[in-house]
Amino acid sequence: SITRTNDRSHDVIRSGMGRSPLFAGAIEGRGPRYCPSIEDKVHRFGDREGHQIFLEPEGLDTHLVYPNGISTSLPTDVQIDLVQSIDGLERAEIVQPGYAVEYEYADPRRLEPTLQHREVAGLFFAGQINGTTGYEEAAAQGLAAGLNAAAVALNLEGARFDRGTSYIGVMVDDLTLQGISEPYRMLTARSEYRLYLRADNAISRLGPLALELGVLDLDQAQRVSTHLEEKGVAASMLAEGVTGRELGISDTARRPLGEWARREDLLATVRARLPAGPANDEAIDDAIYAPYLSRLRDELAARSRDRALAIPSAFDFGAVPGLSNEMRERLVVAGPADLDQASRIPGITPAALSALHFTLARAAA
C-alpha cells in the first residue's frame, strides 16, 4: 500500500526539528544523498504537499509494517505524532522507533584494488568501513574482499574486477582511486560502459574470471563453459550474411543476420533461426546493442581528443541538460578550467562528462 505525508505531518516535523540530532548539531557527518530523512525532505522541499510512503509488510506471518519513506531521528514522541498524522495510520503503534547512526570510515584510497590495505598485509576492508552505503554495495565488496583474502591465504593470484566488465570493478576503482566526500552509492551513471554491463550477459562478462579463479564447483564450471561455447556459436551464426528474402521479406540485400535482428518485425524470425536458450538470446541482444556500443566508443574517443576544451569562467553548469544536482554541485565547487580538469574531479561520473562535453562542443562549433 501507498500513503503520503500531509500538511499536518509537516507541521509536526517542523515543530520537532530542533530536537533532531541531524539539525541540532549532534550529528555532523553528511548522510546518504539518495536516502534523505523525512525531516531533511521537509526542510529541503518545503513547498511539497506530501511525500510518498510505501507500507511494506515485514513478512507473511507478522502484523508489522515498515513505512518506507519516513526514516527519521526525531524523538519518539514526535515520531508517534508524525505517524498518526498520516492518512491510514491514525491508530498505528510504533514497535521500533527510527534512529540515526553516524559511523566512521577508513579512507579507501589506502586500499589496493583487491581491497587489501596497502600498509597492512592480509587486512581487507569491505562495506560501510570504506564509506559506501547500501546492501548491494556492501555485498559486492564482501565478495571481492573475500575472494582476495582467500587467495592470499592460499598464496594464489587475487581477483581484480575491471570497470569495463563489472559494476564491482567500477565501484572498487572509484573508491580506491578517488576516495569519497560523502556516502558512496553505486549508480549506473558511474560507468562509462553501462550499455555493456547488462544483467543478461553476466556469465559472459564474469564467467571467464570465475573459471580462472577456480571458485566454481564442477557443475557450475561446466554450465559456464557450455554457455560461453553456445554464445560463440550463436555469434558466428549472427555474423553470416543473409538476404531479406531468406527471412520472408522482399529486400534482396545481404546483411549479417545480427543486423536484421535490429528490425522489430524480423526479430522473432531471427530468433527462430537459432537454437532456443539464454546464450543465444544474449548473442542476439549483443547484435542489437552493437551500434549503440560503437557510438559509445566514438563518444569516449571524442571526449579524449577534446580534453583541452575550455570551460568559460562564468559557465552556467545549471544549463547543462542531464546533469544531476550532485554533479552540478561538484562542478561548481571545483570550477574546472577545461574538460580534462572536470574529468579528474572526485565523484564526477562518465554520464556527467558526456553531457558537459556535448554542451561545450556544441557551443564551440
Where are the regions a protein language model picked out?
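A glycine-rich dinucleotide-binding beta-alpha-beta segment and adjacent secondary-structure elements
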Residues: Y66-N130, R160-D173, P278-R330
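An anion/pyrophosphate-binding glycine-rich loop and adjacent beta-alpha core
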Residues: S1-I80, G88, L177-A261
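Extended, charge-enriched "interface" segments that sit outside catalytic cores
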Residues: R190, R198, A202, G207-A364
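Glycine-rich loop(s) and the adjacent beta-strand/alpha-helix scaffold that form part
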Residues: I86, R91, A144-V152, A342
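Charge-dense, low-complexity polyampholytic segments
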Residues: N155-I168, H357-A365
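Glycine-rich phosphate/pyrophosphate-binding beta-alpha loops
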Residues: Q128-E136, E192-R194
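Internal hydrophobic alpha-helix adjacent to the cofactor/substrate pocket in enzyme cavities
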Residues: A138-F161
